[in-house]
């Protein structure tokens, strides 16, 4: 990992969304130098599912040598941002670094993204970044080490990611486009850059999106913190860059990236905003004996499932059912399959003993999954992770996401038989 140099001692770092996850990790890294940290986040009271508040983060920051100023800030509220900036100036005398980390996410396609969710992503990601930047810039311009760092992806017009997550992509790209504009607008005064991970990062949000077991495919938040720390030490002339965490750390001389892995040696889930991963990551994944299902369609030369593969899969699923499985799951799944051997199938894990069949279930489905027959067979045979299928757009899910995650556990039990 990247060692601390002490160069941020006395600097004031204003971080949105710093009560947990990536934001807190960046805060702790800077705090080890003796930096002042403004924790600008919403969570003042403990959340039932997400650990950490602005006050617990402040305790951790001060425990490693930093000074903390916890501020209740919803980045959608301009007055709350302004109030936090004023408190920071009053307590620390200035602001040297702004990290726009707060973000809202919904991995849904256009028709499945409610307007309320669209507004949330636009207001937190795009508008919130603008408001925080605007409030801090007058003070950043007075700093000798002024930086704005947006946690946002490089601009990539490949439609692969836009296709299934258009609203989220636009909201994040808004953050990235501020880098283009502000880097030029404040050239020579403030360095403005973006930082994004090469692979999935393990956070509470990733657990909610990916479900149990996703952490083994992720890196720790420490890699983003180290990459951000590297950027903070660069001169103002380093501006307008879209930095990938692994790349900048290689420039710092880091060679062993297993130290950042949750499960060293396990294949990592690549980030889909990037085009660079297919060949390099495929080779690494294949070397472990796994199947690199994240490849682009044009790179996939997988054979079609044999005739009747779907029916055979459901037969094996049915043989695997039991009262214990039904009791543990309590859900009805509907599969809308396209392609060869396509059609509508159901998996009833509510009725005694469970049941499968072709057509509609007798009761309303709790979860509807849409995919090709090829991908259905691969999922149930363990060659395609449901999380990867969902995030790459191969799998569409409607209904109860918690019950969808339960099905993944059942799939894991059946893999050996399929």
From Swiss-Prot:
The modification N6-(2-hydroxyisobutyryl)lysine is found at residue 42. One of its GO terms (molecular function) is oxidoreductase activity. Residues 306-415 form the SCP2 domain. The keyword Mitochondrion applies. Its main location: other. Ubiquitous. It comes from the Eukaryota. NADP(+) binds at residues 17-23, 42, 74, 172. Keywords: Acetylation, Hydroxylation, Mitochondrion, NADP, Oxidoreductase, Peroxisome. Signal peptide: none annotated. The modification N6-acetyllysine is found at residue 116. Belongs to the short-chain dehydrogenases/reductases (SDR) family. Has apparently no steroid dehydrogenase activity. Controls bile acid (BA) and lipid metabolism in response to nutritional cues. This is Hydroxysteroid dehydrogenase-like protein 2. The lineage of its organism: Eukaryota, Metazoa, Chordata, Craniata, Vertebrata.
């Amino acid at each position: 990992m990247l060692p601390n140099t002490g160069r941020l001692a006395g600097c004031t770092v204003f971080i949105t969304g710093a009560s947990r996850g990536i934001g807190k990790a960046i805060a702790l890294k800077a705090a080890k130098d003796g930096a002042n940290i403004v924790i600008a986040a919403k969570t003042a009271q403990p959340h039932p599912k997400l650990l950490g508040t602005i006050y617990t983060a402040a305790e951790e920051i001060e425990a490693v040598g930093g000074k903390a100023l916890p501020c209740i800030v919803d980045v959608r509220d301009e007055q709350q941002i302004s109030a936090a900036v004023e408190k920071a100036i009053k307590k620390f005398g200035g602001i040297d670094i702004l990290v726009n980390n707060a973000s809202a996410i919904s991995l849904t396609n256009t028709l499945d993204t409610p307007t309320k969710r669209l507004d949330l992503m636009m207001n937190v990601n795009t508008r919130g970044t603008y408001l925080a930047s605007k409030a801090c810039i007058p003070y950043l311009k007075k700093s000798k080490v002024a930086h704005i760092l947006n946690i946002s992806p490089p601009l990539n017009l490949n439609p692969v990611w836009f296709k299934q997550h258009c609203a989220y992509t636009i909201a994040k790209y808004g953050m990235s486009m501020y880098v283009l504009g502000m880097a030029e607008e404040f050239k020579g005064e403030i360095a403005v850059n973006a930082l994004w991970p090469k692979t999935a990062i393990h956070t509470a949000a990733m657990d909610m999106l990916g479900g149990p077991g996703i952490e083994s495919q992720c890196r720790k938040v420490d890699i983003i913190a180290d990459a951000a720390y590297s950027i903070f030490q660069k001169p103002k002339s380093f501006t307008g860059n879209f930095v990938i965490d692994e790349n900048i750390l290689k420039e710092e001389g880091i060679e062993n990236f297993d130290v950042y892995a949750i499960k060293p040696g396990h294949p990592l889930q690549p980030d889909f905003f990037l085009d660079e991963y297919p060949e390099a990551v495929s080779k690494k994944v294949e070397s472990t004996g796994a199947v690199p299902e994240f490849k682009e369609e044009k790179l996939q030369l997988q054979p079609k499932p044999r005739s009747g593969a779907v029916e055979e899969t459901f037969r094996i699923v049915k043989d695997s059912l039991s009262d214990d499985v039904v009791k543990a799951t309590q859900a009805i799944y509907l599969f809308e399959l396209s392609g060869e051997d396509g059609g509508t199938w159901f998996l009833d894990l509510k009725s005694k003993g469970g049941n499968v069949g072709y057509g509609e279930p007798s009761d309303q489905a709790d979860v509807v999954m849409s995919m090709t027959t090829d991908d259905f067979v691969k999922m149930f045979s363990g060659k395609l992770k449901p999380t990867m299928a969902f995030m790459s757009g191969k799998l569409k899910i409607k209904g109860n996401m918690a019950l969808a995650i339960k099905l993944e556990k059942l799939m894991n039990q059946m893999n050996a038989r399929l």
